[in-house]
Amino acid sequence: MVKSKLLCKRLNDIQNEITECNTRIKELLGVTAEVFAYPCGQKFVGRDTNTKSYVPLISKMFILGRGWRDEALVDPLFCDLSQVSGIEMDGKSFDEILPLIEEAKKNGQWLILAGHEMGEGGVQTTQLSMLKQLIEYIQNPSNQIWIAPAGTVAEYIEKNRQH
């Protein structure tokens, strides 16, 4: 019984912390947070038989919840916007990212690249040289790539797909 109470407290704590963060973001930046990035891609709290997902909480609070180090591209017709795949771009070259872009384009999928800091070195660093090549590729109209903030894409998907 004690474990259940702790788990509920953790879920409540998560909700309270996110609400407080959203309030601060609004106060400091004047914008409303619409997209949530799961810390380290973790979508649950607790252990063993007491494990509980907080995806339903994110679903109520945000238009989109993004994972981390996922392996699959996002199918806009099927995806659960409260837990879409985020594919790591930290430490990757453009040659490693390009096949993912081409696969997404070919199959009508959505590629969500996720990274941490930007620079030329470090374990969780998106390489500036890769970003430069990526931007040049995306800006070329002949490549027919739509790039937009995740929240904008989520709104488009929600508006245009049939449930």
Locations of the language-model features?
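Catalytic domains of cell-wall/extracellular-matrix polysaccharide-remodeling enzymes
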Residues: V2-L98, M130
